[in-house]
Amino acid sequence: MASHTSIVKAGDFILRTPVLRSIFVPAAKLFCAYSGYRQLGLKFDDLIHEENPTVQKALSRLPKDEIYARNFRMLTAAQCGITHHLLSADKALKPSEDTPYLLPYLLELEAEAAERVELDNVEVAK
């Protein structure tokens, strides 16, 4: 499985390359529009599989207000699923509101893990 860091690097490469950007950015916007998670009130970071130890640690580092907002979005989406209804257009999440809140913590944790592995494999020269 690819790490979040490698996915971000690939995304940055796509955004720096004009030809790839002209292909992938409209496709990504179309995918987000048709996936329907915003009509349930969810942000993209809410879709990250949370039974991963790295994600669990990142969730524990979130500020209290962000944890509350995440839980509220999850409960709203669950209620929409139970009732088989989508949120109205004024209550659905706008694309401008879909900002990453968990990804910075995940990247920080992956950098810490890489640094830990590097320090564990240091050979001391005498």
Curated annotation (Swiss-Prot):
UniProt entry keywords in alphabetical sequence: Electron transport, Membrane, Mitochondrion, Mitochondrion inner membrane, Respiratory chain, Transport
One Pfam family recorded for the sequence: UCR_14kD
Membrane topology term: Peripheral membrane protein
GO cellular component: mitochondrial inner membrane; respiratory chain complex III
Keyword Oxidoreductase among UniProt keywords: no
Gene Ontology process terms (BP): mitochondrial electron transport, ubiquinol to cytochrome c
Keyword Chaperone belongs to the record: no
Chief localization: mitochondrion
Compartments in which it is found: Mitochondrion inner membrane
Superkingdom as given in the UniProt entry: Eukaryota
Record InterPro entries: QCR7 (IPR003197), QCR7_sf (IPR036544)
Segments crossing the lipid bilayer: none
Family that this chain belongs to: Belongs to the UQCRB/QCR7 family.
Subunit structure: Component of the ubiquinol-cytochrome c oxidoreductase (cytochrome b-c1 complex, complex III, CIII), a multisubunit enzyme composed of 3 respiratory subunits cytochrome b, cytochrome c1 and Rieske protein, 2 core protein subunits, and additional low-molecular weight protein subunits. The complex exists as an obligatory dimer and forms supercomplexes (SCs) in the inner mitochondrial membrane with cytochrome c oxidase (complex IV, CIV).
Function noted in UniProt: Component of the ubiquinol-cytochrome c oxidoreductase, a multisubunit transmembrane complex that is part of the mitochondrial electron transport chain which drives oxidative phosphorylation.
Name by which UniProt lists this protein: Cytochrome b-c1 complex subunit 7
Gene: QCR7
